[in-house]
C-alpha cells in the first residue's frame, strides 16, 4: 500500500483544535487500485463526535456519496490519541475489524502527538487477531482480549511504502 508522507502532518493540523481540547478526531483513508497497487490519495474527515478516548462518525451517507462520486475505495482509517500512547485500544480493534473484514489490506493509523512514538500504522494479525476480534462478544466498549499477537505494526512488514506525493483533503465536518 502506498501512503503519502504528508498524511500525518496534514491530519494532525486538521485535528489540532480537537487535540487541544483532548478530543479524538478520525478520518477515512481513501484511494484507488492501479496496477495491483493500493494508493491512498484522499483523506476524508467525516462529520463526527469525539471524546477523550473515542471518536464516532455521523451522517455516513455524505461520506459514501463523496466516495462514490469520486470513485474512491476505503483503505482504512486514521485517528488521534490526544494524550494516550500510540496503540490500538479494544474499541479501535473492533472498529478496525470491520475495515479489515471488508478489505484484508486495510490499515489503522494512530497519531499520538504528545507521545513517542507518535505515529503507528497497524493491522490485525490473521490469524489469530482477526478471528479473535470478529468473534468477541464483550458488551463493554473497553475490555481485554487474550494475550496473543492481535495486531501488528504494518510499517515493519514491508507492506507500507511511504512515498512523496500530495494527499487530497476533504473535510465534511
Predicted regions and their residues:
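Conserved beta-strand-loop surface patch within small alpha/beta domains used
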Residues: 1-74, 83-173
Amino acid at each position: 500500500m502506498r501512503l503519502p508522507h504528508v498524511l500525518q502532518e496534514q491530519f494532525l493540523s486538521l485535528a489540532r483544535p480537537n487535540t487541544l481540547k483532548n478530543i479524538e478526531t478520525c478520518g477515512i483513508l481513501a484511494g484507488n487500485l492501479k496496477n495491483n497497487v493500493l494508493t491512498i490519495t484522499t483523506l476524508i474527515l467525516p462529520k463526527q463526535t469525539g471524546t477523550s478516548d473515542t471518536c464516532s462518525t455521523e451522517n455516513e451517507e455524505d461520506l459514501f456519496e463523496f466516495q462514490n462520486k469520486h470513485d474512491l475505495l476505503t483503505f482504512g482509517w486514521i485517528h488521534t490519541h490526544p494524550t494516550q500512547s500510540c496503540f490500538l485500544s479494544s474499541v479501535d480493534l473492533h472498529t478496525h475489524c470491520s475495515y479489515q473484514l471488508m478489505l484484508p489490506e486495510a490499515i489503522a493509523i494512530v497519531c499520538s502527538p504528545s507521545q513517542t512514538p507518535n505515529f503507528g500504522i497497524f493491522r490485525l494479525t490473521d490469524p489469530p487477531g482477526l478471528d479473535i476480534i470478529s468473534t468477541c462478544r464483550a458488551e463493554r466498549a473497553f475490555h481485554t482480549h487474550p494475550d496473543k499477537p492481535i495486531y501488528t505494526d504494518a510499517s515493519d512488514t514491508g507492506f507500507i511504502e511511504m512515498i512523496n506525493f500530495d494527499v487530497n483533503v476533504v473535510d465534511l465536518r
